[in-house]
Amino acid sequence: MDMRVPAQLLGLLLLWFPGSRCDIQMTQSPSSVSASVGDRVTITCRASQGISSWLAWYQQKPGKAPKLLIYAASSLQSGVPSRFSGSGSGTDFTLTISSLQPEDFATYYCQQANSFP
């Protein structure tokens, strides 16, 4: 059975703090992915300036609160399946789903935690 479904897997979270000396923009790519169950999916996130490893990844499904998947760039939150992994530091980060499952079709966000207004 062909499980290929156009799905919005990714979201864009732009963090911009006007008037701050440490404005940080987060840009995800690609903006959307069409994927099948079993596929390896990679999402990238780039910070406009270095944030060390202060990055988290979230999953959100319609009508639900965001769920923390990865914190400190590569640490798996308790209870999150090991098919999710994170890597990177500085400005470039990656979220990988090693084998996409039906329940993984969702929107994914990165969030920096290096600076706040």
From Swiss-Prot:
It comes from the Eukaryota. Gene3D superfamilies: Immunoglobulins. V region of the variable domain of immunoglobulin light chains that participates in the antigen recognition. Immunoglobulins, also known as antibodies, are membrane-bound or secreted glycoproteins produced by B lymphocytes. In the recognition phase of humoral immunity, the membrane-bound immunoglobulins serve as receptors which, upon binding of a specific antigen, trigger the clonal expansion and differentiation of B lymphocytes into immunoglobulins-secreting plasma cells. Residues 72-78 are annotated as: Complementarity-determining-2. Immunoglobulins are composed of two identical heavy chains and two identical light chains; disulfide-linked. Keywords: Adaptive immunity, Cell membrane, Disulfide bond, Immunity, Immunoglobulin, Immunoglobulin domain, Membrane, Secreted, Signal. Residues 1-22 form the signal peptide. GO terms for biological process: adaptive immune response; immune response. Residues 23-45 are annotated as: Framework-1. Residues 79-110 are annotated as: Framework-3. It is found in: Secreted; Cell membrane. The keyword Phosphoprotein does not apply. The keyword Signal applies. The gene is IGKV1-12. Disulfide bonds join 45-110. This is Immunoglobulin kappa variable 1-12. InterPro entries: Ig-like_dom, Ig-like_dom_sf, Ig-like_fold, Ig_sub, Ig_V-set, IgV_Light_Chain. Residues 46-56 are annotated as: Complementarity-determining-1. Residues 24-117 form the Ig-like domain. One of its GO terms (cellular component) is plasma membrane. Residues 111-117 are annotated as: Complementarity-determining-3. It comes from Homo sapiens. Residues 57-71 are annotated as: Framework-2. Its main location: secreted.
